[in-house]
């Protein structure tokens, strides 16, 4: 992916090693991590270890896939993490993901970032379909997926969790 990727209000950029302190606001938050397969980080040192694994994961992905930092365009304020990557690291489906700090929930940032990544996946990567895997009780995430044009398809088991599969297929040109 030609990072940074910019939207109207946001920048999606590669992680840096010094992001651990600000990323801890996300990875250390029980309110965020209860919606993921991972428990909250206990401290910044544990978040730094997770960040190193995240950066290594992204480095192993094909071009255009991975997990990245999300920040405000005007201030460079760190907001959270977003990504586009093969489901469970192996595919064949591709997942869009978003984990933002609770203090920035409700501002449309997750929707704006996810839309941008989905459009990038369709346009630049030639993807036919993108999914979001969401815990059934995560109404906020389900709302983001719906606002991105995704529809609920089915339940499924991924990452050791019972999740809902939301999906969007690339629009077809009609003549």
Model-derived regions: residue spans:
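Conserved beta-strand-loop-alpha-helix junction that forms the acyl-donor binding cleft
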Residues: 132-142
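Short alpha-helical segment within the catalytic ATP-binding CA
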Residues: 99, 112, 140
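GNAT-family acyltransferases
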Residues: 1-103, 116, 120, 124, ...
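Conserved active-site tyrosine of GNAT-family acetyltransferases
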Residues: 145
């Amino acid at each position: 992916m030609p990072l940074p990727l910019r939207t109207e209000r946001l920048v999606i950029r590669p992680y840096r090693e010094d992001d651990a302190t600000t990323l801890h606001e996300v990875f250390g938050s029980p309110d965020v991590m209860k919606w993921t397969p991972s428990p909250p980080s206990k401290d910044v040192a544990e978040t730094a270890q997770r960040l190193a694994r995240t950066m290594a994961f992204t480095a192993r992905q094909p071009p255009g896939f991975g997990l990245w930092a999300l920040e405000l365009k005007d201030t460079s304020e760190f907001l959270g993490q977003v990504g586009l990557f093969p489901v469970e690291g192996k595919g064949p489906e591709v997942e869009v993901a978003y984990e933002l700090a609770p203090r920035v929930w409700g501002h449309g940032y997750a929707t704006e970032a996810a839309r941008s990544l989905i459009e990038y996946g369709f346009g630049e990567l030639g993807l036919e379909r993108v999914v979001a895997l969401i815990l059934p009780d995560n109404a906020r995430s389900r709302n983001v997926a719906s606002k991105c044009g995704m529809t609920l398809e089915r339940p499924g088991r991924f990452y050791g969790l019972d999740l809902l599969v939301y999906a969007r297929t690339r629009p077809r040109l009609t003549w």
